Amino acid sequence: GILRETQRWTLKEEMGSFLLDLEWRGEGLTDVSVEKFFVGGLFLRMPWFKGISGTVINSVGEKGSSEAEGHRAVWVDIGMEISGIADWGHIAVLDHPDNVAFPTPWRIDSQLGVGPSRQILGDWKLGKGETTIERYRLVVYTGPLDQAKISRFWKDYVCESRN
């Protein structure tokens, strides 16, 4: 083997939103090199189709792939219309300050797909016997975009993990 990958997912409900936490661990079973690339790691693909209303915005206010692609941010929110409900559905992906590339640059495509991607910054290596850990929280909610609420969720996430 080359890499031992472990994922731990936890789910809870808070303030009318679902919080899905991911802790990803990669242990080098040999020396591993990951080359610079525009994608990699966690990626959230939305049920996009031509003509659907939706938007992506990051924590610094950049919108869509034309403004936010490859840029660093502590969170990214994807919102879109969903058939059968009046409000938009949203998934905010929160970066964690213990992640190696924090704030991580984000891959944001033109079809509302997003993912944090540390290899946007360049090559990285993991030595044999070394472990790297990446943490993210997905906040799933409906209604209008509320950047202040997402920022509170991010601060709570950081404080929880530090206790």
Where are these regions (language model features)?
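Acidic (Asp/Glu-rich), glycine- and aromatic
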Residues: 13-55, 149
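RNA-interacting cores
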Residues: 2, 32-44, 122-134
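Beta-strand-rich recognition/accessory modules
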Residues: 91-163
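Acidic, glycine-rich loop-and-strand cores that form catalytic or ligand-binding grooves
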Residues: 78-82, 86-94
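Glycine-rich (often Gly-Gly/Gly-Pro-rich) flexible segments and glycine-rich loop motifs
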Residues: 41-83
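Hydrophobic residues positioned within well-ordered beta-strands of beta-sheet architectures
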Residues: 5-7, 20-22, 42, 76, ...
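Hydrophobic beta-strand positions in extracellular immunoglobulin-like domains
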Residues: 9, 25-26, 138
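Extended, loop-rich substrate-binding clefts of extracytoplasmic carbohydrate-active enzymes
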Residues: 1-16
